[in-house]
């Protein structure tokens, strides 16, 4: 009885192992060949530079205020010193708040990136899912990610097929 159970378990394990099919995609390659992704990244870079310039302008203004304060400190009364220090701290806080608003974890750049890239990512995901369903893949791995893939056979590489399905080849 034990032998029969062991043989059955071994047979089931062997069938399960044979039933799994894998595929590889190179997302870096795919995204480089999707013009909408390149345009979205260019838009994000432009808006990021604009917002960074705004933050830097406030930081520069705060720095200038501090230098002026340093030059005038000997001539100021305690009340004037306190007023100038508060103005400098307010300007630094304003710069910090603006930086957080634009570049923070839930900032404008994050929202804009999500709005621009989510439709592209969804389209790619749906195409990968369609290919996987058609070919019976259990798992699709991104070879460009740090997944520790040392070798992947070109036979299971579907990046070009994915680009064709998306209409870019």
What kind of region is each of these model predictions?
Residues 20-135, 139-147, 169:
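Amphipathic alpha-helical segments
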């Amino acid at each position: 009885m034990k032998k029969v159970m062991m043989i059955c378990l071994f047979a089931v394990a062997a069938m399960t192992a044979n039933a799994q099919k894998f595929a590889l995609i190179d997302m870096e390659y795919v995204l480089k060949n999707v013009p909408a992704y390149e345009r979205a990244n260019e838009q994000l870079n432009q808006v990021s530079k604009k917002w960074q310039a705004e933050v830097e302008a406030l930081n520069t203004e705060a720095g200038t205020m501090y230098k002026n304060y340093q030059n005038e400190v000997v001539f100021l009364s305690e009340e004037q010193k306190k007023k100038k220090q508060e103005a400098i701290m307010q300007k630094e806080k304003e710069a910090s708040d603006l930086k957080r608003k634009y570049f923070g974890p839930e900032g404008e750049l994050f929202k804009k990136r999500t709005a621009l890239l989510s439709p592209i990512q969804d389209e790619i995901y749906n195409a990968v899912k369609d290919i996987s369903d058609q070919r019976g893949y259990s798992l699709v791995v991104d070879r460009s990610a740090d997944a520790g893939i040392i070798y992947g056979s070109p036979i299971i590489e579907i990046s070009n097929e994915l680009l064709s399905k998306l209409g870019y080849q």
